[in-house]
Amino acid sequence: MLHAMLLAGRTALVLGFLFTSLADAQDLGNSAARPTMPFQLVSGFLVVVKGQVGDLDGLKFILDTGTSYTMIDRKVADRLRLRRRPGKITNFDRDVPIDWAEIPNLRLGPFQTGAFRVLVAKLGEYSRFAENVDGIIGLDLLGRSKKFFIDYEKQTVSWELAEDRAGAPPSPTYFAIPFIVQGYPVRLILDTGFQGILLYKERLRQRLPNLRTEGEEIEVGMGRLQTTQVKLPGVCLFGPETVATVFLTDGPVTGDLPGVDGYLGIASLKAKRVEFDFAARVLRWQ
């Protein structure tokens, strides 16, 4: 069955659920008329494609809907001799120092950006899963399309391009989708760059001071991210309530991402195909 959820966009407000028809489900698998490129599935969940920055071709990029801004590794910026200015971003529970830079062009599938502002960081410090890639493509580029498709069975990604990009709305900074925990709604960022369900424990306990868990709590390190793995009953994304394995961690130290309670890795949907419909502001999967 194909399910759909409203896309939250910049406000992270979820208005409700949408359900698509069987015809929509059949359309989701038909990519013959769309620009398509293959990807490599890394670590069972990461979508890695090849692209070009400036005159550097064959670079590896993670496609990550949990990242607002496209990033390149410091070594790529060094090779291009880019001028930079300092900044910082929030990565799950901590601030990470980065630089801003402007690249001459980024080519990925149907996209040719021209001059494009990106973040520059040592990606191995940003995420242990990014140690062997050259960049991370965020929603600032993925959101330029009308629709974006991931086919995990065929290991291809494809796009339906907007006819008039000049009149299109700005790309969303993140998706926030509804998630019910023991009767209370929370909002999670949908993240193709994460493999599980991550919840900010203090934000969750503010809403649920009597939060119930089952079994033993296990401390789990994810690179520099320290989490506690628990089994959480009374969880509902769609359909009946279930018991889910989740990871609890501290929230962002700066209080960033207001109204966001964590991240939902797209692997948790166990989807064969996923469609991000930016025009209709809807997520579909089957």
List each model region and its residues:
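N-terminal secretory signal peptides that target proteins for export/translocation
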Residues: 1-7
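Bacterial N-terminal signal peptides
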Residues: 8-21
